[in-house]
């Protein structure tokens, strides 16, 4: 019997127990044995080279469904062309993060099947709310009105995504609030700039294509769109190495990509709560934090829905984060690799469980 002692109520506990961060490993002399490679999944690690590849073999004693492969090798191929070439030539059986610029060519390749799955994965452009000029909510609103989200989806994602509304809850997820969609409106942006006394606003926006293929192009397009509102956005192309240690959470206006989280509480607690380590916009909103605490333990689904709707509205209208879009998961596989009719979109390769759920035909 597993007994979990909690400091406070959490209605999402069943979902948290399925999150990939929760792992169970062998214990040796009362300490976790990280080196054995054994866990509770269907495969065990036989070789691990960080940044190169990881190899798994199926546990002989696995008795549940799945784990149809005798072994699995996950290879790191950061270059999109290298990934797609490896798939076409048959060197690998499946790839993640298909290059959207060449996706139409890949679709025509013989023996290749594309998977396109709606996801809660999203891009954020967080602004430090405690650093000028972003400490003024009207400046933040001006920058939110100065971005043409649909054009970005069309030109950067080639249609493989859904429009964002400046909060992190995707239309494909529970508790999504059908709020009025913020649209590109340079005149409203000018209104808020004038209200803030920030006409002629100039800001720098940092990005790197290592975060997402097309990240810099997206920021350049945003910069062009913002000119109609009289906003000058200087796009800073940052080095790929060290982006997460030297740019994210360090510079006041940056490009970030988030994976989906299982519930609104997890996402809000990670990146929007006032004292969260990953509060990337330094946003402080007492009402939001009050609702976050209440919703965490609320078992009445109707009340919880209302709370999360208000929280999404607060993010949209007061928060320091622009959420331009949610990305689809675009993956590709050899036609002899099969999977269930429905696959997960929270992480790549069927919620990072493709090796468990998929099979060869």
Annotate the PLM regions:
Residues 31, 60-105, 223, 232:
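Ligand-site clamp/hinge motif
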Residues 55-60, 108, 135-224, 291, ...:
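Append "and occasionally in soluble cytosolic enzymes with long acidic Gly/Pro-rich linkers
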Residues 2-4, 41-44, 54-55, 70-76, ...:
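Short, well-ordered beta-strand elements
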Residues 81-91, 108-109, 137-138, 217-229, ...:
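Short helices/loops that flank or line small-molecule/ion binding pockets
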Residues 11, 49, 123, 147-174, ...:
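Detector for C-terminal structural segments
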Residues 98-109, 260-265:
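A ligand-binding cleft/hinge motif common to bilobed small-molecule-binding domains
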Residues 8-9, 15-71, 79-81, 186-187, ...:
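Gly/Pro-rich hinge or "lid" segments in bacterial periplasmic/extracellular proteins
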Residues 1, 7-11, 20, 48-50, ...:
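Solvent-exposed coil/turn segments that connect beta secondary-structure elements
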């Amino acid at each position: 019997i597993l007994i979990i002692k909690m400091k406070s109520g959490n209605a999402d506990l069943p979902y948290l127990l399925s999150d990939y961060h929760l792992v169970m490993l062998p214990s040796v002399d009362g300490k976790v044995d990280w080196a054995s490679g054994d866990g509770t999944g269907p495969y065990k690690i036989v070789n691990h080279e960080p940044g190169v590849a990881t190899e798994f073999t199926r546990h002989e004693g696995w008795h549940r469904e799945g784990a149809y492969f005798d072994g699995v090798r996950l290879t790191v191929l950061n270059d999109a062309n290298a990934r797609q070439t490896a798939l076409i030539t048959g060197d690998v059986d499946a790839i993640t993060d298909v290059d959207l610029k060449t996706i139409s060519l890949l679709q025509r390749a013989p023996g290749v099947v594309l998977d396109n799955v709606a996801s809660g994965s999203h891009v954020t452009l967080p602004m430090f709310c405690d650093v000028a000029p972003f400490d003024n909510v009207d400046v933040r609103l001006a920058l939110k009105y100065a971005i043409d989200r649909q054009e970005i989806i069309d030109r950067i994602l080639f249609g493989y995504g859904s429009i964002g509304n400046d909060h992190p809850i995707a239309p494909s997820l529970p508790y999504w609030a059908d709020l009025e969609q913020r649209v590109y409106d340079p005149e409203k942006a000018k209104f808020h700039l004038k209200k803030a006394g920030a006409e002629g606003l100039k800001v720098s926006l940092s990005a790197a294509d290592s975060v997402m293929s097309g990240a810099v192009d997206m920021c350049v397009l945003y910069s062009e769109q913002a000119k109609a509102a009289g906003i000058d956005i200087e796009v800073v192309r940052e080095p790929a190495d060290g982006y997460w240690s030297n740019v994210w959470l360090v510079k006041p206006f940056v490009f970030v990509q988030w994976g989906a989280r299982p519930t609104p509480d997890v996402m809000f607690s990670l990146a929007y709560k006032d004292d969260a380590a990953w509060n990337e916009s330094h946003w402080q909103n007492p009402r939001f934090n009050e609702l976050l605490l209440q919703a965490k333990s609320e078992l009445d689904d109707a009340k919880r829905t209302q709370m999360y709707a208000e929280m999404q509205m607060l993010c949209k209208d007061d928060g320091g984060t622009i959420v331009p879009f949610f990305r689809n998961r675009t993956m590709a596989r050899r036609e002899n690799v099969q999977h269930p009719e429905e696959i997960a979109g929270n992480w790549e390769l069927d919620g990072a469980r493709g090796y468990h759920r998929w099979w060869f035909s």
